[in-house]
Amino acid sequence: MQLNIVLVELEIPQNTGNIARTCAATGSRLHIVKPMGFTIDDRKLKRAGLDYWHLLDITYYENLADFFEKNAGGKFFYFSTKAEHIHSDVVYPNNAYIVFGKETKGLPEELLHDNPDRCVRIPMINNSDARSLNLSNSVAVGVYEVLRQWGYPELLTKGKLTKFDWDE
């Protein structure tokens, strides 16, 4: 099973680095749609991703049209504070694409309007001062919901202590 994370028009390098680390740790593919508000060799981006960059399967696209053209037939789910469906109420199929917009504006409303049944939101309090979650946190919530539904394929689900055994 393959999970695809799509980031559209990113603005903050640290978020991208954190998301890249999440993708590396979960085996998810990362798709980045330009333009971006920073360069991919940005020092802050590299630091946030630590030494996980070699574990990434990452593809860049010039714009949304380029992305959709190269991923025709994909099963897309659009995360947005404007959506009417809760992210955990959706059943995510194999090879799903979970799509996130830029930090300041989210995804284009035309895209959301044209795909109402594929738009999902992470529940939050009803307070206009709490506009949204941090992008990297939202991606992590989305990724782990999909992986939970899939039974955490190929992920370690039990840890080990360094000084003790759990059975002692």
Model-predicted segments: where are they?
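Post-transcriptional modification and biogenesis factors for structured RNAs
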Residues: M1-E168
